[in-house]
């Protein structure tokens, strides 16, 4: 890529600041306008609680609550979304939400099977230590795919973006199920994760399109309720596949079930898109040529970000296994080039990109900036200890696949249940900030208890208790991150701010996974070599790379005790680092706004009431 000179960059900046067609300038101006509007709205609300204050921000030039945006000023995807909202019946919406509920049920079920079986899949290829490396790659691709997918959903439509995501999802599952080596499995996992991320993102955008702000948290909480059910059956099903079939079938079966659950949603959305086309509702919408689309998707920025994160984080994760690799010129060059790519990415996004994937200027808005920081730290914390936690439970606490899954998913269960009840509380109180503030100490406490109760001498109850506490705090945080950023922008911009926070999230996950991989790969082999009996020291690498081999040593033997001690020592480091990152979330939470949600109606589809 050819870098522009400094003077050219300044000229570009001047043009962008003066160009009223700049999408990012519009969004920033919208935020400023909305902030002043909300202040007026709050004053009006005090005078009359019975009157809802509706706000709309349509462009940089003017503000009106009576004039809707012209179709020719809008992208096709937004027009399609509005048409669905304005012309569909409540029954159609109930069908869509029922399908979303089924889809969340299926993908959560599948995710639990995948999580329960992936340690055995990598062990089958002598690659158990690569769990964190695969997680790094998964998180990087999740970060890279969200901004362009959100824009594609605006340019072409929610339906088209959903179908693309579903295709990636299914191809990834097929590759994993048919893999003959760890490289193919990892590649399939990356595609699967990209599709999973896309499906979840488009569903979130759809729910934002069709729900009011006061109901947003409740709708999101209800959509996550399937996780509460599948947590208890997913690990059991995974164990049955492993014991009576193969881990491959535990993955392959979902290539049939997930598309089937999508059919009602696809049918309704396709029908109304066809009606919109037939009635001419899409005529005159903005058209984008390939060059403009290339700019809007910020392909150059995404390549720089993906390359930078991959070169730095994957190098750290892989090189940590052999300390000698830190002096290897190849790894040093990879890290240096990756760092330069990340620097170039930041500069490109700020000074060059017309439609930046990560609009850093938006982070100057306190709520958006604070939520991005919290999302980043939140997922670093989680992935610092999560990648090897499932193996830890089986090795140290002698759990079965089913029991390890139950304990691991106690966090998810508690988090989803908390999100549901939080939605009800917000619906009643119309406020959310103080729930945010209270959740941070709870989350830190849970992380700290994981340090204390990690040893073999503590029974399963001591493993479940921290997961419940972490789940309560984490459920509030995860739910409110999306709600908070959406209160400071109009619905036209839900996709971009949701994608912004959602992009920072997997970057945090990638960093956390790289940290856990670096610690695991550098410390665990040394602990095994130190703790194993002398007659098994030469087998330390084989033991290190296979969960199946680790579990083959029976309870009470010197070998198993040595493996347990090694796991416990490494787990202490992982959870201690995680607790430190969790503590850092105390600072940004105070910058989050605390509007009264009943006065914040940022809905562009106002010709009718929102369906939800």
Swiss-Prot record:
Subcellular location(s) of the protein: Membrane
Entry-linked Pfam families: TRI12
Protein's UniProt keywords contain Transit peptide: no
Segments passing through the bilayer: 91-111, 125-145, 159-179, 188-208, 218-238, 249-269, 299-319, 331-351, 365-385, 406-426, 434-453, 464-484, 495-515, 573-593
Record's keyword annotation contains Membrane: yes
GO molecular function, one term: siderophore-iron transmembrane transporter activity
One Gene Ontology biological process: siderophore-dependent iron import into cell
Entry-linked InterPro entries: MFS_dom, MFS_Str1/Tri12-like, MFS_trans_sf
Family designation: Belongs to the major facilitator superfamily.
PANTHER family for the chain: MAJOR FACILITATOR SUPERFAMILY, SIDEROPHORE IRON TRANSPORTER 1
Identification of the protein by name: Siderophore iron transporter 1
């Amino acid at each position: 890529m050819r870098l522009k000179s400094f003077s050219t960059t300044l000229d570009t900046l001047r043009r962008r600041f003066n160009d009223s067609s700049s999408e990012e300038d519009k969004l920033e101006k919208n935020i400023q306008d909305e902030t002043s509007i909300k202040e007026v709205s709050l004053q009006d609300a005090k005078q009359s609680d019975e009157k809802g204050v509706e706000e709309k921000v349509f462009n940089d030039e003017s503000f009106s609550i009576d004039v809707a945006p012209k179709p020719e000023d809008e992208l096709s995807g937004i027009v399609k979304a509005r048409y669905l909202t304005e012309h569909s019946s409540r029954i159609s919406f109930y069908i869509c939400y029922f399908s979303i509920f089924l889809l969340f049920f299926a993908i959560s079920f599948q995710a639990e099977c995948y999580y329960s079986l992936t340690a055995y899949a990598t062990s089958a290829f002598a690659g158990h230590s690569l769990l964190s490396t695969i997680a790094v790659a998964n998180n990087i691709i999740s970060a890279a795919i969200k901004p362009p997918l959100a824009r594609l959903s605006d340019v072409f439509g929610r339906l088209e973006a959903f179908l693309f995501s579903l295709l990636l999802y299914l191809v990834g599952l097929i590759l994993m199920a048919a893999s003959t080596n760890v490289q193919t499995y990892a590649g399939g996992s990356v595609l699967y994760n990209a599709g999973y991320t896309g499906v979840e993102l488009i569903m979130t955008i759809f729910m934002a399109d069709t729900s009011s702000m006061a109901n947003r948290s409740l709708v999101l909480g209800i959509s996550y309720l399937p996780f509460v059910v599948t947590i208890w059956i997913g690990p059991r099903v995974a164990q049955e596949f492993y014991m009576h079939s193969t881990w491959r079938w535990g993955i392959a079966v979902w290539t049939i079930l997930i598309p089937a659950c999508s059919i009602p949603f696809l049918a309704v959305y396709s029908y109304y898109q066809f009606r919109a086309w037939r009635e001419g509702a899409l005529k005159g919408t903005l058209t984008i040529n390939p060059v403009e689309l290339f700019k809007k998707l910020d392909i150059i920025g995404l390549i720089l970000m993906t390359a930078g994160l991959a070169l730095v984080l994957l190098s750290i994760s892989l090189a940590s296994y052999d300390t000698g690799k830190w002096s290897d010129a190849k790894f040093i060059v990879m890290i240096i080039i990756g760092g330069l790519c990340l620097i170039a990415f930041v500069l490109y996004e700020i000074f060059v990109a017309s439609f930046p994937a990560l609009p850093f200027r938006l982070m100057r808005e306190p709520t958006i900036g604070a939520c991005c920081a919290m999302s980043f730290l939140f997922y670093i914390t989680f992935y610092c200890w999560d990648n090897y936690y499932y193996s830890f439970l089986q090795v140290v606490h002698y759990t079965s696949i089913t029991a390890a899954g139950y304990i691991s998913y106690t966090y998810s269960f508690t988090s989803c249940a908390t999100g549901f009840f939080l939605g009800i509380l917000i619906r009643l109180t119309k406020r959310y900030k103080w729930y945010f503030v209270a959740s941070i100490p709870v989350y830190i406490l849970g992380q700290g208890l994981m340090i204390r109760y990690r040893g073999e001498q503590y029974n399963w109850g001591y493993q479940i208790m921290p997961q419940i506490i972490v789940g309560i705090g984490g459920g509030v945080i995860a739910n409110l991150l999306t709600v908070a950023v959406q209160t400071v922008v109009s619905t036209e911009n839900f996709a971009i701010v949701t994608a912004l926070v959602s992009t920072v999230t997997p970057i945090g996950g990638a960093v956390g996974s790289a940290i856990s991989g670096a610690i695991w790969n550098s410390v665990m082999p040394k602990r095994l070599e130190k703790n194993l009996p002398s007659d098994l020291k030469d087998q330390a690498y084989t033991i290190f790379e296979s969960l199946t081999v680790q579990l083959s040593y029976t309870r009470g033997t010197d070998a198993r005790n040595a493996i347990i001690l090694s796991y416990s020592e490494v787990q202490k480091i992982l959870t201690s680092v995680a607790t430190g990152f969790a503590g850092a979330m105390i600072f940004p939470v105070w910058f989050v706004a605390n509007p009264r949600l009943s006065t914040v109606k940022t809905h562009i589809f106002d010709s009718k009431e929102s369906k939800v």
